[in-house]
């Protein structure tokens, strides 16, 4: 055994997953390694560095298409990482829909990527990448689809810039999945403490850099989903109000709104409070929400 192998065992380095092993969380893959997180939207690229200790550090935003940003910033981005490793969140060119009766087989994301028809059946389209979030209490699922051509374009641009992609995700969908998990835990606790009273309907509002996903549920069944990319800005929130209005108007006494938003959370919360003054709002938003999700999971 080489001395280097002994030192790896003593330091537990040999038990750490490789950076390109997507079956592990980002936090485990980059223990004591610097990495960079990027969020791609229509108007530009936001980024946040992660230290070797796993802490979020310097950040920034540059307007313009990804190709131009990488040409300008590739050296700086590389310097913020160990060996050029990055994770990317796409905030455009995706669709989230509500589907019924999809298979609940224990299939990995690799199976969904390689043979989506085995999971989605006739709903599978050529040239798409998919991800799923199932409702454990009903036959409904939230389905994310992204153009495969767009994913390949991102991969090609990063490779040409000397950077490595460890993960590509959709920020809104990741935040939706996190929200649904928290709602499921809260619902279980509510049932344990309240055997007679029924939990009211829930309107989940997910907002990430102007893109939104709104999911309505009644008695733990998902009944309606609306998703829009680059819907609103800080200067023009009216499009968000328009899409929310019919769903908010359907809320009854005892229903509630669950909000999970990025930096624009206070603006969205103010809008919801004005639209539904008598409805309870559970705001689970956190500072740097998308960056925290990307750096840990």
PLM region spans:
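Hydrophobic/aromatic-enriched cytosolic interaction surfaces used to assemble or bind macromolecules
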Residues: 1-297
């Amino acid at each position: 055994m080489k001395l280097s192998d002994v030192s790896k065992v003593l330091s537990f380095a040999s038990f750490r997953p490789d950076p390109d092993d997507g079956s592990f969380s980002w936090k485990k893959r980059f223990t004591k390694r610097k990495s960079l997180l990027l969020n791609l939207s229509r108007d530009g690229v936001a980024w946040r560095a992660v230290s070797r200790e796993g802490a979020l550090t310097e950040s920034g935003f540059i307007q313009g298409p990804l190709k131009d940003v990488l040409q300008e910033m590739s050296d700086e981005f590389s310097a913020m990482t160990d060996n050029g490793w990055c994770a990317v969140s796409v905030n455009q060119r995706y669709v989230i829909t509500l589907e019924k009766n999809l298979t609940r087989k224990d299939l990995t994301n690799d199976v969904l990527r390689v043979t989506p028809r085995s999971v989605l059946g006739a709903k599978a389209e050529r040239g798409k990448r998919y991800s799923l979030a199932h409702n454990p209490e009903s036959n409904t699922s939230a389905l994310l689809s992204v153009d495969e051509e767009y994913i390949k374009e991102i991969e090609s641009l990063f490779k040409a810039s000397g950077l490595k992609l460890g993960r590509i995700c959709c920020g809104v969908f990741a935040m939706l999945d996190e929200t649904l998990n928290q709602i499921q835990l809260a619902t279980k606790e509510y049932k344990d403490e309240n055997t007679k009273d029924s939990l009211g309907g829930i309107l989940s509002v997910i907002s990430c850099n102007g893109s939104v996903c709104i999911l309505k549920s009644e008695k733990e069944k998902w009944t309606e989903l609306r998703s829009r990319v680059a819907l609103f800005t800080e200067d023009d929130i009216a499009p968000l109000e328009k899409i929310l209005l019919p769903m908010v108007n359907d809320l009854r006494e005892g229903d509630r709104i669950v909000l999970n938003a990025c930096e624009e959370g206070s603006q969205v919360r103010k809008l919801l409070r004005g639209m539904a003054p008598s409805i309870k709002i559970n705001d689970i938003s956190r500072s740097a929400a998308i960056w925290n999700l990307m750096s840990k999971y």
